[in-house]
């Protein structure tokens, strides 16, 4: 997923996948799951080096309780593993070379709208609401929270800001779980805290970042046998692992090479995707029309896709080869961001998080 802001990654060696205990689809709460009990268990599971353990435990327990999620060790460790991978439990993590990245983004936007660089630099010399010029603030920016605030001020106060960015702040993720701000804004209903400002600003707080990050990780039903597929979905989008397995089945049935990225259709476009065209090639064997195929693929961002005739018939054909085709695989997506300086993939991210999850489960014993 190409974004101006992509989740942070910490270098570790890729480990082999281990079979997980428990079903990854079970996220409903149990009657005995009291907030105090969840907090107590979190204090046991949090890594030893985490500061303000009570604060982290309280915010995470609140998210589980208010969202009705099962606070099993599997689920709690999954949340802690993602948080450790993304920010090492820093509510406002520093990003290396963020000032340079920000200036490059501004220059890119200026070139795109044909605004001379010197005009942009002149506009950035204007004093911002905190008394410092935008240039000064950009030169010293260290975190995405700071950068988001700079862009908010620049867009609201300076005409040049709207020329370059419209009304859209280019910082797209934030907080200790590096959750998408657009996701948070779309899922703000039921947020248990009084919002002092905007949902964007809440994402950069520990309580908000954890609430929306946990919702993104566990707040949807999935029939995954292992949590690692949720970790991949956290990075690539809900149901990306399931959809990538569907794409692989289609590719093997047709001989057509497909990107196993989990994107089944071109959302927002009438043009058929490569996956849809490949499925159409199976139309006669599936006994389905092009329009019926498209309607089924449109459900690819929900659990309902698994109940469609298309899903069932494709896997029925795939299973006839003698070996049952997997219903979930790690998507083959290369991560792109100015913050990433080497080749990383969604599978790399998921495997990293899974390693941390396993270490957390050891602490649960």
Question: Model regions: which residues?
Answer:
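Cell-wall glycan-active module
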Residues: 2-7, 22-365
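Bacterial N-terminal signal peptides
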Residues: 11-21
């Amino acid at each position: 997923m190409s974004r101006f802001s992509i989740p942070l990654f910490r270098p570790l060696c890729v480990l082999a996948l281990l079979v997980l205990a428990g079903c990854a689809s079970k996220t409903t709460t149990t009657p005995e799951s009291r907030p105090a009990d969840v907090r107590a268990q979190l204090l046991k599971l949090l890594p030893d080096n985490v500061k303000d353990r009570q604060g982290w435990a309280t915010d995470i327990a609140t998210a589980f309780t208010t969202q009705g999620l099962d606070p099993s060790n599997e689920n709690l460790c999954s949340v802690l593993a993602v948080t450790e991978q993304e920010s090492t439990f820093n509510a406002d993590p520093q990003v290396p070379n963020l000032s340079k990245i920000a200036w490059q983004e501004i220059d890119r936007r200026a070139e795109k709208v044909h605004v001379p660089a010197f005009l942009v630099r002149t506009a950035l010399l204007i004093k911002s609401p905190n008394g410092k010029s935008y240039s000064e603030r950009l030169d010293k920016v260290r975190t995405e929270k700071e950068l988001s605030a700079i862009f908010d001020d620049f867009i609201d106060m300076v005409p040049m800001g709207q020329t370059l960015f419209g009304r859209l702040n280019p910082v797209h993720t934030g907080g200790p779980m590096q959750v998408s701000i657009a996701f948070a804004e779309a899922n703000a209903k039921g947020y248990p805290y009084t919002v002092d400002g905007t949902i964007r600003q809440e994402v950069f707080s520990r309580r908000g970042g954890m609430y929306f990050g946990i919702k993104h990780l566990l707040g949807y039903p999935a029939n995954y046998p292992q949590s690692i597929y949720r970790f991949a979905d956290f990075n690539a989008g809900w149901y990306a692992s399931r959809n990538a397995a569907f794409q692989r089945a289609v590719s093997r049935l047709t001989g057509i090479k497909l990107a196993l990225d989990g994107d089944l259709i071109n959302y927002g476009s009438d043009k058929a995707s490569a996956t849809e065209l490949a499925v159409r090639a199976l139309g006669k064997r599936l006994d389905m029309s092009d329009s019926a195929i498209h309607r089924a693929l449109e459900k690819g961002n929900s659990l309902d896709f698994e109940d469609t005739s298309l899903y069932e018939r494709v896997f029925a054909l795939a299973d006839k080869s003698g070996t049952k085709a997997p219903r979930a695989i790690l998507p083959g997506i290369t991560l792109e961001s100015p913050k990433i300086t080497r080749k990383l993939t969604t599978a790399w991210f998921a495997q990293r998080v899974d390693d941390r999850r396993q270490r957390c489960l050891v602490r649960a014993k």
